[in-house]
């Protein structure tokens, strides 16, 4: 069964692209949100026999229902453009120092960061506003936004696949098509969250960083790193790991990286600083004040210990995520950044490449590129494991990198990553209330996912340096 299906979609690269495009643009992007979803749900569940077609597709509509984050993006764009907003976003963030979005719909443009407080750095802003320029309601906005994220992911997929194919010693005839097809399967495992959040942009920028490192384009490596730092802050920590993995040494090369990074940061953060001088400190303060996320490593361990001791503690919604309250959780949250830096340091140490002597031949291209890609994956995993906040959409960052590994190693890496994202999709869309309320199924599921992430991290570290 699976053999003919695989051959059908990997005969040519274009067939694989068409499959992955269908998954991302259509299949993951077809459901409803807000009041439209509620009406569909109530109508179908009340009389399934009267709506057989809706009853048949209900499981998929439920699985891919629109996310509250998309409603928040819609309200943000509406506030900036002065357009009406029919969705209520007042409860999405929970307790938060950010004021509620005012959407008077008076047609007056408002200056982002100065008149509309935002938690999204400037590189994300065009992706939030553009779909609102093209639509008049949340339903169509969500479809356009999802298609935009799908386009970014498809581009990242093709870039990653070509990195792996071009560095392989003897690539198979359909190697690129197989990688792109596998990326579509990873999207299916990850679910609609891959196109319902802004993290597709981070995924694209990270794979562009890796491509620049592979090609030895130091200024571009720095530029993409600066831009990803301006987009999401923490992923810029992948840069020092890539510098060591790709053997960037010497003042001239490091200077080119620094210059490119400065340009990327200025272009990415400059609009925020110009439009609202207090916006950057506000965003940094906002994220530093967030509590210990229930899905983070420390959050999972803390919640598990409390549950085992018979004193399970429910989280509360604040700053847009479910976090543990209390002094112990607060202390663990403060330890998250040092822990993250330590994990990245371990990956950096394992990633360092030995300098090539003049009398030696050039290093094997397959091994060199594999080291760079695995280093990027391992550093990204370190950010997940060490972070105070670990939302499932962060897993999107690694999807294009998984298919960028040369040879056939990408298959095993993609499989384990696929298990991680599949578990995440199951609990997020199936029983997330069990997670944030710390009920048994939720606690056990989080331990299972943390274990899978540990296996994934060890697999990558062993490939870097077989201790």
Language-model features: locations:
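Secondary-structure junction/capping motif
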Residues: 66, 112, 121, 293-305, ...
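Transmembrane-lumen/periplasm boundary regions of multi-pass, lipid-linked membrane glycan transferases
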Residues: 262-293, 297-313
